[in-house]
Structures are given as C-alpha cells and as structure tokens.
Amino acid sequence: MDRGAVVGFLLGVCVVSCLAGTPKTSWRRVSVGEDVSLLPAPGPTGRGPTQKLLWAVEPLDGCGPLHPSWVSLMPPKQVPETVVDAACMRAPVPLAMAYAPPAPSATGGLRTDFVWQERAAVVNRSLVIHGVRETDSGLYTLSVGDIKDPARQVASVVLVVQPAPVPTPPPTPADYDEDDNDEGEDESLAGTPASGTPRLPPPPAPPRSWPSAPEVSHVRGVTVRMETPEAILFSPGETFSTNVSIHAIAHDDQTYSMDVVWLRFDVPTSCAEMRIYESCLYHPQLPECLSPADAPCAASTWTSRLAVRSYAGCSRTNPPPRCSAEAHMEPVPGLAWQAASVNLEFRDASPQHSGLYLCVVYVNDHIHAWGHITISTAAQYRNAVVEQPLPQRGADLAEPTHPHVGAPPHAPPTHGALRLGAVMGAALLLSALGLSVWACMTCWRRRAWRAVKSRASGKGPTYIRVADSELYADWSSDSEGERDQVPWLAPPERPDSPSTNGSGFEILSPTAPSVYPRSDGHQSRRQLTTFGSGRPDRRYSQASDSSVFW
C-alpha cells in the first residue's frame, strides 16, 4: 500500500466514518506489560447471513508521540482526531479473523479461524493483546463484511503504549524520624533486632479539622479565561462561526483595556502538522522565531492582523463587552464579525478560508490568553501541535511566516485612506491659495515701487500729498519777534559746520512763506539750504522746486 493510500485510509477512518454516522475513533493509553482488550465485535445477528470479522493494525511506533486534537463536526459534537505523516507508517498487518454468528467452541465466544500474532486472541467478541509492548502502538481497526462482499470498517482505536511507571519501594523504618526524648530512645532500643521484635511504622495521624476562615484574595490585575475548539471541519458553501468563549475577571478597581486579535496562517499541503511555538507569541522578534528551521510548517511570528476588536475603559463593574468597543477587520470575502461578539463568521465558506487561526487576548498590551483553531475541509485538515521551547534556527534567513489576508481584487478604500485623501486635498488647496496671495502681493508692491520711482525722477513738480492748510503757516510770518516768543515754533537750527561723514541724504528745510504754487500760474522759487556731504568750510545753496517729499 503506497503512502497516498495510507493517508486516505486514515482520513477515511478519522473523518468519513464520523460523517457517515459510524462509531468514532477513540484513543487509549496503556502501559507496557498490560493485557488490553480492544474493539468488541457486534452481537449475534440471529438469522442473518454469516459475517466475517477482521482485526488489523497499522503500526505507528516510528511516528513519535501522537497529539490528538478535538475536532468540531457539526458543533457542538467533537471527536479526537490527528494527522500522521505517511512516511513513518507501515503497511496494515492483520491480527485475527472470525465469523459471526459464532460457532460453539470449548472456550466459549467466537471460534477464531485465523490468528497471525502469538500474543493476540479473540475473547468474548473482542481482540485481546497479552503483554503489550511499545512497538504495539498503532491504529487498530475492526472491519465487518459478508462472506462474498468486501469488509466495511465499523470501529477504530488508536493505541498508545507508554513505558511502565517505575514502582516505588515501600517505606522502611529508617524513613521515619525518631523522637529525641528518652521515651523515644527506649522505644527504639526495644525495637532493635536484638530484641527480636521489628519496629513498626507509626500509624498515620488522623486528619486535623481546621476552623473554616474566609478566603482572602491578594491577586491583582485581570484574569482571562478562554475556551476554543481546536479544529472545525466544513464543506464548501457552509456558513458557520468560531465558538470562542472569553471571560475577563478583574481583581481590583483599576481600569484596563483589552484587545482580541485574530491571526491566520497558511497550512501548506506538504506539512503533516503545524507547530505553534508559544514562546514566539510572547517574544516574536527573537532570531529563532524570525527564521525557524521548519518555517513553512511553523507559526512563529506575524506581520499583520486579520481582525481586532478593542475594548477601552473596562473595569470590575464594567467588564467586556459592556465597555466601549471598536472593531476592525481586513476586507476578506465571506468573512465578518458574528454580531457584536469576538467570534468570526464564515459565510459561503470556500477552501480559501482554510488555515490555522490564532485568537490572542491582550490586556494593557500584554498577552493574557490565547487559543488556536484549525479551520479547513476534510481533505485539507492538518493537526496543530503547541511547542513550548523555541524553534531551531534555520541556516539561511527565511522569510518569517505571517498571516495571509486575501483581499478582493477591487477592495473598497478604508476610512483611513479616505481621511488621508481629504487631508492631502485640503493641504494642496491651502498651498495654492497661499501662493496666489503671495503672487498678488508681490505684483502690487512692484507696481507701487515703480510709481514712487517715477515721481522721484525730477521731470516735473510732483505732489505726493496735498494738504488743506499750509504746513508752515506759523513760519510764514514776517515778524521775527513772533517766532522768538514761541520757542516750539522756531525753525530748527542749522549747524554751521555739517558732518563730513554724512549718509549722503539731503535734508530740505523750507525758508519761504509757502511751498505751494501761487494762484497766478507760475511757480515760486524759494531759497532752500542743503546739508549733507559737503565740506565743513563751505555752505551750498540751491534753488529747488516747490515740492516736498514725505
């Protein structure tokens, strides 16, 4: 029998038989040296045709320790299942064959026609193995069929043979402490071998009844309890949900936040089982977790989250889900939240939904509980094993395993992308508006500068400002005495020797009664005195137009 046939046979035993309503596969653990009775045959059929009963075994002693998992078949029904690598299995070996209804025999029960193992026998319609050994571990099956028809498997059991426990020797008199008082010494002397009476161990003291006292709890923080099915098998097109139960118990009055995070890992068909390294859940950045040796079949670290439901402001009096909640989920076709709970709902499930799902509970950003569920079809099912130690580091740096999120080809934009687009658009609009205002101000200032420069060119009289009254009306008086009487009306004194280090600017001081043109149409020429960059021993006088620059 090739390996494919062996795997198909196992799946038929573990899955198809359960779906067809036949007895489920059971697990049994025994110790070396015991006599084991397995797989009782169906009772006598009376007038029915004679049936052939066949017991066989598929050895699993080369597959290492087996880890059964509880698989949900049409919840809440659960059965223990596992997937065994075909490379470690051997061909099925027949053990015994009998016929029913039984023919009378000297020992009673079924008359066994063939027995292929010296330690096997059929007693009271059951297969009995005398003095089991570790090599007897395997998958035992019972098949029933007519004489002319092929046999049909009706029951199976996985037998795991463990080493026998080491017997502890009975206590000796030396194991008991002797009293230090004189009476104890007399008793020990009286019980010496010389006296001929061996010393007997003291009788056990009767249990003392302590008065009941109220329990005092010193626990602080939050305790989280989680219950998850280890596996869920579905058929394409079904609608089902994860049956996860989470209970958070607060031991003090402090507020806390809780996040329920769902992760998904692909399960390659080349893997006989998936390994979940618990240490990597708490320390995902370790080198062993980033590049495990069995990377395709290991759930060690991740880069994204499938779904998150966050609770904030929770306390002892306001536990989840009563505290404020916020949910986020990647857009995956056929996947949604089950109402307002922490469970996932699969609608019209397809084989693409198969995988290893992890549910991790964070309290104040620290892991408090986690569980795993293998969700797949019967053909894609692989067992998941939790490993406590760190994985072995791979020789080459492999890409870390991470949850796979299958987004649709044209996924709608999320709210975060919409908000980012709105902010970017507003920023661009404000930038364009600011540039427009800056350009207008620059153009206006340039035009104003040209106008002022043209007025100062000296081509003709230019009046920057026309006042409605004479600016120097008080200075236009011919009476020098009047100016002397009012000190603050006196014109500024002219220095006789201006500084030779002047800035080059001309300070114009009026000396005429008025600086405005006369009404008869001609311009008045008034004497103006200029101070500036001339030599200190010389005073310059020049005539200027009747215009003043402010």
Swiss-Prot record:
Annotated function: In epithelial cells, the heterodimer gE/gI is required for the cell-to-cell spread of the virus, by sorting nascent virions to cell junctions. Once the virus reaches the cell junctions, virus particles can spread to adjacent cells extremely rapidly through interactions with cellular receptors that accumulate at these junctions. Implicated in basolateral spread in polarized cells. In neuronal cells, gE/gI is essential for the anterograde spread of the infection throughout the host nervous system.
Compositionally biased region (Pro residues): 164-173, 199-209
Compositional bias annotation for Low complexity: 403-413
Gene source species: Human herpesvirus 1 (strain 17)
Virion surface topology ranges: 21-419
Residue stretches of biased makeup (Polar residues): 541-550
Coiled coil: none
Biased composition (Acidic residues): 175-188
Keywords: Disulfide bond, Glycoprotein, Host cell junction, Host cell membrane, Host endosome, Host Golgi apparatus, Host membrane, Host-virus interaction, Membrane, Phosphoprotein, Signal, Sulfation, Transmembrane, Transmembrane helix, Viral envelope protein, Viral immunoevasion, Virion
Cellular compartment(s): Virion membrane; Host cell membrane; Host cell junction; Host Golgi apparatus membrane
Glycosylated residues (UniProt): 124, 243
Pfam families listed in its UniProt record: Herpes_gE (PF02480), Herpes_gE_N (PF20418)
Self-association state and partner proteins as the record states: Interacts with gI; this interaction enhances the Fc receptor function of gE. The heterodimer gE/gI interacts with the Fc part of host IgG. Interacts (via C-terminus) with VP22 tegument protein; this interaction is necessary for the recruitment of VP22 to the Golgi and its packaging into virions. Interacts (via C-terminus) with UL11 tegument protein.
Signal sequence bounds: 1-20
Sample GO molecular function, one term: identical protein binding
Similarity comment text for this entry: Belongs to the alphaherpesvirinae glycoprotein E family.
Designated name of the protein: Envelope glycoprotein E
Region (Interaction with VP22 and UL11): 470-495
Region (Interaction with gI): 63-88
Annotated region described as Acidic, given as residue ranges: 476-484
Renumbered residue ranges of the record's region Disordered: 162-214, 394-413, 476-550
Modification Sulfotyrosine, positions: 176
SS bond list: 271-297, 280-289, 314-323
Residues exposed to the Intravirion side: 441-550
Example of a GO cellular component annotation carried by this entry: host cell junction
Region span, Fc-binding: 235-380
Effect after changing residue 432 to V: In strain: Nonneuroinvasive mutant HF10
